[in-house]
Amino acid sequence: MVMAVEDSVVRVVVRVRPPTPKELESQRRPVIQVVDERMLVFDPEECDGGFPGLKWSGSHNGPKKKGKDLTFVFDRVFGEMATQEDVFQHTTHNILDSFLQGYNCSVFAYGATGAGKTHTMLGREGEPGIMYLTTMELYRRLEARQEEKQFEVLISYLEVYNEQIHDLLEPKGPLTIREDPDKGVVVPGLSFHQPASAEQLLEMLTRGNCSRTQHPTDANATSSRSHAIFQIFVKQQDRVPGLTQALRVAKMSLIDLAGSERASSTHAKGERLREGANINRSLLALINVLNALADAKGRKSHVPYRDSKLTRLLKDSIGGNCRTVMIAAISPSSLTYEDTYNTLKYADRAKEIRLTLKSNVISVDHHISQYATICQQLQAEVAFLREKLQMYEAGAQALQQQCSPQPPTLSIPQSLSSSSLQPGPSSQSSTLECHAKNETLQEESLGSDAQGQEIVEESASEQEQCPQDKQCPTQKPEPNLPGSPSPSVQAKPGTGQHSPQKQDADHSKQLALQVLRLAQRQYSLLQAANLLTPDMISEFETLQQLVLEESVDHRAESPRSPALARGDPLAQALCSESKSSGYCGPVTRTMAKQLNGLTHTLGAPLAPDCTSDKTFQKPTKEKKRKLTPEEPGSLPAPNLEMKRQRQSFLPCLRRGSLPKAQPCSEPRTPKRERASSPSPSSRVCPATVIKSRVPLGPSALQNCSTPLALPTRDLNTTFNVSEESPSKPSFQEFVDWEKVSPELNSTDQPFLPSAPVFIFTKGRKPSLPAVTASKKRRTMRPSVSRGRSCIARLHSSTLKKPNRPFTVPEPPLSPHCLDDQRTPKGLTGVTESY
């Protein structure tokens, strides 16, 4: 038990009761004069003037004066007009704080019979005493601390009557007193009650007062014939358990002593006389204890506690570990002159009693049995936290695997989404992978040149998928591969989140996606180098058909997904020109570079655009790049004001859809052209006639060509330009011809008009039978190309054939060829976007 030691003294207050009607009738002079709140004068001198007509009775009417004009100083003096609340505020209200801190407290009222002790302690209806007020205040403070601490309140109520102890709450026979080394003075058999509220406690106090012994005497009509002791025990502890938990136990004693009386004044006889004698004996023992404690002044001396049962019960309250308040009740009348004087004398003597206060705090260190329970709780908490941490780490690993970044792949334009090439069933993925392996062998022998045509076709394929009533989003391209001017962007995986069970399927889709990208790049490289054979074209078309079927199924599930809109099937790439609104964007220098370098080799008819004129957007500044050191022949493009372009013959191309082309290192024609990258052969492999449509260049510096005369006949036919002396077609004049730069002077270079005009490459006429276009692709022999090219080629037998036949979709007839006898089937070598 840990105790905080504190020195204190007994606090003494004096209360002067009002005069009774009997005292007023006797016209006795008062012997008490209250000077201030702390001082009073006993038996003051009579004033010479006095009151006119008022004469005090002589000495024969009262006792002689003793200690005339005596002054007493106390901690507090209450006059005749003081209320019960005033007495409570300066007595028990102040010591309640110490009581809740674990200090024992005691309040007792001392005085002669009829001085107002019981009225001060118990009060009456409508004017409760200190016991009632203290109980209410105690419960109010306990409720204020209820959230922090747990409280347990016990009460007991006993009386000492004729030197016998009786229980007032449960009346029974006399009880004995025992000394306990730890608890001090105890009364075995005394009942303790635990009230649930302050009202219940007051009800118990009222019931005990009714059991108390009272008899009227001549001095007091309601004289108490016993000493009453009301005790309150409070045990409190913190609500949060722990090793530092402390248990506080305190006791408060509210004592109403019986008044000393004189037999001559009370005229007591028989039982009342014996009661009075026992009361006086116990009070005498109390006075002796007070004198012994006052004379000791901290020294060890004998204190006669055993002279009376009252002093034994009050051992802790008066001279022990307790904060004590003594209320001295006196009468102002001279009828009680001797009793008042004795009360003031003993009260003044009690002020000299010094006390040693100790706070009763029981440390939790002594409760070893709680350690095992606390250890079990801590172990359970550690196990729970470890399990929670493992679950968190497992979830983090799964999320990291799910959101792992894709490996570096080939650069593709932003307009192409990776989700458009994702295969569906596993059988199709295996077929695509087999085709891509053979194409990889061809790519290694060709290098990494001529990527411009690939991007042009991809842009055209993207424009097909956009619905006519909506505008396809245009994104700014960014260069990705060094040495390649083609704008590209890294492919992004699907935005959908997959569960861990679908990781295997996602891995297969990603693998198939990489294979399709490789095949796409292979096709563009072969096409740009003019190394495609009919067998290769057939295999690539078969591969494109598989992707088309998967895109159609995937589009049916989520038609509004932006990623599906980028999957461009082959059939839509050759849609009718009548369904397109034409290319309305400006022809940039980058577009002219691509077409200037590619159309000399292959004239690739690009797919028409499916967007309307209302959805065109202005080109971004990123489209106009600066000249690189690899293009010394390029001249700076003139600054042209932004304006709305006329309908171009390339409806599949929107603004920003044509990426930059790979520059060539060797001239493909005798005319002045841009340099291209090295190629195994300087000659172009002649093939069947391929007609192409390219946009109008902004100036001759960009197209490196001179204007030609417009043809006056329909051009939607098949021409053979491999003859020795091809005829030079005539051209009609354009409406916007004055907008073309005057630098277009030479007539021996290809020209990019703004109206539908076809540009053809020169070559010798192939000796092939006049059959349909699809039959020509299948029956063409590699020897025809080998006779006119020095580039090493792989024989068509080394390429793996598709598992199923593929039919090249035929484009619809153009309105310009309705009066022509020939059909578009005569066109061969048409390139489709992949």
UniProtKB/Swiss-Prot annotation:
In complex with KIF2C, constitutes the major microtubule plus-end depolymerizing activity in mitotic cells. Its major role may be to transport KIF2C and/or MAPRE1 along microtubules. The gene is Kif18b. It comes from the Eukaryota. Residues 9-353 form the Kinesin motor domain. Belongs to the TRAFAC class myosin-kinesin ATPase superfamily. Kinesin family. GO terms for biological process: cell division; microtubule depolymerization; microtubule-based movement; mitotic cell cycle; regulation of cell division. It comes from Mus musculus. PROSITE patterns: KINESIN_MOTOR_1 (PS00411), KINESIN_MOTOR_2 (PS50067). This is Kinesin-like protein KIF18B. Residues 411-432 have a biased composition (Low complexity). Its main location: nucleus. InterPro entries: Kinesin-like_fam, Kinesin_motor_CS, Kinesin_motor_dom, Kinesin_motor_dom_sf, P-loop_NTPase. Residues 611-620 have a biased composition (Basic and acidic residues). The modification Phosphoserine is found at residues 484, 634, 657, 814.
